[in-house]
Amino acid sequence: MLVIRLARGGSKKRPFYNLVATDSRNRRDGRFVERVGFYNPVAAEGTENLRIALGRVQYWTGNGALLSPAVERLVKEYSAKVSAAA
C-alpha cells in the first residue's frame, strides 16, 4: 500500500522532513517513489518552512495512497495558506 509520510533528514537537534510517497513496508527514511514536498519545523522567521506539490498529492491519493496524520495536517494547513494568498 502506498502512503505519503514524513521522512526525517537534517542533523541532530535540527530536524528537516521530506514529504515522500512510499510503500508502507519501507523504512521511515528508506526508499521512496517521489518527493512531494518538505517541512522545516525550525526554519528561521521569514524563510519558507513548508512547500507541498498539491497536484502530486492529489495524483497519489487518486491512485490509492493514504496520508499519514501528520501529513494530512500539513496539507490542510498549506492548502489554506495557498487559497488565502490567491
From Swiss-Prot:
One of its GO terms (molecular function) is structural constituent of ribosome. Keywords: Ribonucleoprotein, Ribosomal protein. It holds the Pfam family Ribosomal_S16. The keyword Ribonucleoprotein applies. The keyword NAD does not apply. One of its GO terms (biological process) is translation. Gene3D superfamilies: 3.30.1320.10. GO terms for cellular component: cytoplasm; small ribosomal subunit. Disulfide bonds: none annotated. Signal peptide: none annotated. It comes from the Bacteria. HAMAP family: Ribosomal_bS16. Belongs to the bacterial ribosomal protein bS16 family. This is Small ribosomal subunit protein bS16. The lineage of its organism: Bacteria, Pseudomonadati, Pseudomonadota, Betaproteobacteria, Burkholderiales.
